[in-house]
Design a protein with these regions (language model features):
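Polytopic transmembrane helical bundles with strong interfacial aromatic enrichment
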Residues: 2-158
Length: 158
């Protein structure tokens, strides 16, 4: 593979990785961090919609990871003798660990809490006991992704 071709493949994968991150992680963090509004109103439809968005964009974020792995395996255009990164680089495995944590919070805590809140609101009950949990989960997801971006930019140990 020629250096020019390799450079174009690298740029294409970088573009797709960033585009996927913007269009998948952005809406995920937005939905997660604002989901508690649906419980404060209370609005069952908004809670159901927030749960659906968080679930959908959590799964779509897998594309970001796949593209990142593809990008990582490319030869660095600035030094064709080495790969962009390796799985053992601290910033890579820490980012993956934090992404798994964000997925666990989103799918294991936030989505079930929003679904339960929607049922409670629909039944005429109050979801007040879940507001704090939903707000904390949304904040945690936002913080986890902010740290992932920080790791991607500064690449400590890489």
């Amino acid at each position: 593979m020629t250096a020019g071709y390799r450079h174009h493949v690298f740029k294409l994968l970088l573009f797709l990785h960033l585009l996927a991150a913007i269009f998948a992680v952005g809406p995920l963090v937005g939905a997660a961090t604002t989901a508690s509004r649906a419980l404060r109103r209370p609005d069952a439809d908004a809670a159901t919609s927030a749960a659906r968005l968080v679930r959908l964009y959590s799964y779509v974020s897998i594309v970001v990871v796949i593209l990142g792995m593809g990008l990582m395996s490319q030869k660095a255009p600035w030094d064709s003798s080495e790969e962009v990164a390796q799985i053992g680089d601290p910033w890579i495995w820490l980012s993956l660990l934090l992404w798994v944590c964000a997925m666990a919070v989103a799918l294991g805590l936030l989505v079930p809490s929003l679904t339960r809140a929607a049922v409670e609101i629909g039944g005429g009950g109050s979801p007040s006991a879940l507001v704090g949990r939903v707000a904390a989960a949304g904040g945690a997801i936002g913080l986890l992704y902010a740290v992932i971006v920080l790791l991607m930019v500064y690449q400590p140990g890489g």
